[in-house]
Amino acid sequence: MTAKRGIGRHESLADKIQRHRGIILVISVPIVLIGLVLLLMPGRSISDSVVEEYSVHNRKGGPNSRGPKNYAVIFDAGSSGSRVHVYCFDQNLDLIPLGNELELFLQLKPGLSAYPTDPRQAANSLVSLLDKAEASVPRELRPKTHVRVGATAGLRTLGHDASENILQAVRELLRDRSMLKTEANAVTVLDGTQEGSYQWVTINYLLRNLGKPYSDTVGVVDLGGGSVQMAYAISEEDAASAPKPLEGEDSYVREMYLKGRKYFLYVHSYLHYGLLAARAEILKVSEDSENPCIVAGYDGMYKYGGKEFKAPASQSGASLDECRRITINALKVNDTLCTHMKCTFGGVWNGGRGGGQKNMFVASFFFDRAAEAGFVDPKQPVATVRPMDFEKAAKKACSMKLEEGKSTFPLVEEENLPYLCMDLVYQYTLLIDGFGLEPSQTITLVKKVKYGDQAVEAAWPLGSAIEAVSSP
């Protein structure tokens, strides 16, 4: 029989451990396991934290690229082709890169207006652009991402029924094929003031001018295929004195509230005076006879807006002076048509030509023809020129023969060579006689605008995207 411990006996440490060994085992096992887990985890030094913070704050999209994102998909259905732009914005309306670029931009030819009698084929021409654009938007965000199709002047020239049939086919394509969000007015023909004001917003947004006084913004001339738009900010006083537009015409002034400041934007769109449409207007002046704007050696037909126009060159070749004369005629540069104090051409009020017009950015076909004519670098997104540079290039183009065209102007597409004299003369005449610029005045030709360390296409769709993501 084992004797009991005496009540007064002193218990050693070994005896205590022996007596409580079960409890100690239960406590020690989890502690050991936790220690092993911590030991096996990778270490994180102070320098690691600094590197991660630096990379977040110095990536192209900035610190907000991890926050909420809004995408917008904008189709530009122009007269010379269809284009799609995909943009991504953070909560501050700053652009976030898509891959290595600040936008996804894709284009193809011909445009919707090339299918005036086949709406379904017109809509299907957008399928490849739509699929690639939608694939760039995260799947979970597609139902919240606005898609817009803005048809411009080329479709307007087809007439209401033909253009509406094409637009309806595009609506059905988006409904049946896309997860993107379409509103009731998502597919439409843009009116001239929309196109011009969106372009103005785009360029001034990229230049970070929005929020500044109107005189610190830049004016914009956008020469498309079917129409040309002029837009610039004017004073409240000039806006108040703006003449009322004729019946059926758009208002001369749009009020826009951007970045905390109200702007009064003069904007006008000249339908039939885009570069491709203007060719038809100039050919109409000479009717079916020889035209002094056509390069020597050409005798063909010019097709535009579903119509054909005879385009025979003069036997003596093109003439810059004679081409200028009939171009001024086509522009209707005639003071008797002007019922206002100041006009551009065709009896249109010019907006007063205040501070918002002192710096002019000129886009689209102005840049393209200047690059093809060789007096700006096509690889550079921006170039500073003077209107007289177009006249100088026109002299060269008007004096050549058609067979010399490819060697003289290697960057010009063959189908455009017969009309190169006409295009350059028209652009010079539009700037000088139409918009009243001085021949030696400095203007900025713009293809893309630098935004941070990226270059963004200087086109109206970005302005439309800003409006889309700002709407509820």
Swiss-Prot record:
Glycosylation sites (chain numbering): 334
GO CC annotations on file: Golgi membrane
Regions of this protein lying in the Lumenal compartment: 43-472
Compartments where located: Golgi apparatus membrane; Membrane
Main location as per UniProt: Golgi
InterPro entries the record matches: GDA1_CD39_NTPase
UniProt family annotation: Belongs to the GDA1/CD39 NTPase family.
PANTHER family in the cross-refs: ADENOSINE/GUANOSINE DIPHOSPHATASE, APYRASE 2
Function of the protein: Catalyzes the hydrolysis of phosphoanhydride bonds of nucleoside tri- and di-phosphates. Substrate preference is ATP > ADP. Functions with APY1 to reduce extracellular ATP level which is essential for pollen germination and normal plant development. Plays a role in the regulation of stomatal function by modulating extracellular ATP levels in guard cells.
The protein, known as: Apyrase 2
Organism of derivation: Arabidopsis thaliana
Gene: APY2
